[in-house]
């Protein structure tokens, strides 16, 4: 109901557009980048995850520019839900973040009581995840205009 759209198969001719040469790489880029970062850097895993999901999202965006609007909106929608969830946690358990998160291992920046890294993670997850179905299944969005 948010996007008022239906899915339709992508025509075979479109599947062979130059951008789609990177279709498989786009789909597997996030886990590959995440594994490389986890094994070769001392970054906190949440930073590695954010970097991998953003790069994977942009790889999907390059391959499937028709999903750009959906990806951005989905990133913000998931971020909104995540904020509501965290606000509830912070209101019910005021010291929860300080007790559970190792803020010294993060930036220490809290936005309305939520670690900034959590907000970046939420946006990057929604941004990437929203393109997976259409990309993996070779589906196009057919917008409904009423």
Functional labels for PLM-detected ranges:
Residues 1-146:
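Aromatic-rich, lipid-facing transmembrane alpha helices and their immediate juxtamembrane interface loops
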């Amino acid at each position: 109901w948010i996007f008022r759209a239906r899915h339709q198969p992508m025509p075979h001719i479109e599947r062979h557009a130059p951008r789609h040469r990177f279709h498989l790489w786009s789909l597997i880029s996030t886990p590959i980048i995440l594994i490389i970062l986890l094994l070769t850097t001392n970054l906190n895993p949440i930073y590695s995850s954010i970097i991998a999901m953003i790069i994977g999202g942009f790889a999907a965006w390059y391959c499937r520019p028709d999903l750009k609007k959906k990806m951005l909106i989905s990133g913000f929608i998931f971020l909104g839900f995540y904020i509501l969830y965290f606000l509830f946690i912070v209101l019910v358990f005021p010291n929860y973040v300080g007790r559970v998160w190792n803020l010294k291992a993060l930036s220490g920046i809290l936005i309305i009581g939520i670690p900034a890294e959590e907000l970046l993670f939420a946006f990057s997850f929604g941004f990437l995840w929203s393109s997976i179905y259409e990309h993996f299944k070779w589906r196009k969005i057919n917008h409904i205009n009423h």
